[in-house]
Amino acid sequence: MTIIELLKALLLGFIEGMTEFAPVSSTGHMIIVDDMWLQTTDFLGKYSANTFKIVIQLGSILAVIVVFWKRLFSLIGLYKIEGEHDASGTHKLKLRHVLIGLLPAAVLGLLFEDFIDENLFSIDTVIIGLAAGAILMIAADKLGPKEPKTTSLDQISYRQAALVGLFQCISLWPGFSRSGSTISGGVFLGMNHRTAADFTFIMAVPIMFGASALSLVKNWEYINVGDLGFYVVGFIASFGFALLSIRFFLKLINKIKLVPFAIYRLVLAAVLAVIVYM
């Protein structure tokens, strides 16, 4: 394992950590950077490179667990959050809300996993996803309720959870972004941006962990002991930068909303289109 290869692992971990939960599409960025520049398959091999991407995604998931551990543990009865729920308990966020929200994308992902992997992971589809996702985000900011009524996780209804879950299905198209799709959906449904983001991140833990764990089991045989340093550097970088990204994003999202991210996506899509098609 050379210094250059370790620096590539650090860079990919940085990209994964900074983009996984921002509404800019981490998958899109990984495809762009890796396929057009770093090309980890050249020195890791196709299957080992895929395993590496799974490992660094687990780093990002761990960062979400660290940030939301109280809420996540409360959902499974291992921690009690005092004084943060409605007195009636009618709208207290439950594990059922999360399961309802993640079910549509989980089912579609399992049904169409092979089709998506074989047909949608390309620069062309990423460009489309970046642009279309940007339009959705701008529409959410401009057309969503001006005074959202759902301003905390404990006010989310089952109906809202289910509909946000349908919005999450859009993110199966590379470049759309899971957080971009679900936060936009939440805003359309009357959530403020922070509440939609909180629900997005909490909902991401089981679906991302499950998908990553399943993929890791499938690709376990392709892990090369000689590449462990590459995996470790990528995992640590992804975890650290995701932790910073999540905290920063949650502090700002109610103020800046989605339009700045949408503009970035449109610019990136345009630049990629020029590079690829001109």
Swiss-Prot record:
What is the catalytic activity of this protein?
di-trans,octa-cis-undecaprenyl diphosphate + H2O = di-trans,octa-cis-undecaprenyl phosphate + phosphate + H(+)
Which InterPro entries does the annotation name?
Answer: UppP (IPR003824)
Q: Name one Pfam family in it.
A: BacA
- What stretches pass through the bilayer? 49-69, 97-117, 120-140, 197-217, 226-246, 258-278
According to its UniProt record, the EC number is: 3.6.1.27
Q: What is its main location?
A: membrane
Keyword entries, A-Z:
Antibiotic resistance, Cell membrane, Cell shape, Cell wall biogenesis/degradation, Hydrolase, Membrane, Peptidoglycan synthesis, Transmembrane, Transmembrane helix
What is the protein's membrane topology class? Multi-pass membrane protein
A GO cellular-component term linked to this record: plasma membrane
Name where it's found: Cell membrane
* A molecular-function term among this protein's GO annotations: undecaprenyl-diphosphatase activity
Name the domain of life.
Bacteria
Q: Which is a GO BP term held by this UniProt record?
A: regulation of cell shape
Q: Which family does it belong to?
A: Belongs to the UppP family.
The cross-references to HAMAP family, in alphabetical order and at most eight, read: Undec_diphosphatase
What does the further note read?
Answer: Bacitracin is thought to be involved in the inhibition of peptidoglycan synthesis by sequestering undecaprenyl diphosphate, thereby reducing the pool of lipid carrier available.
Q: Relate the protein's function as given in its record.
A: Catalyzes the dephosphorylation of undecaprenyl diphosphate (UPP). Confers resistance to bacitracin.
Q: What is this protein called?
A: Undecaprenyl-diphosphatase
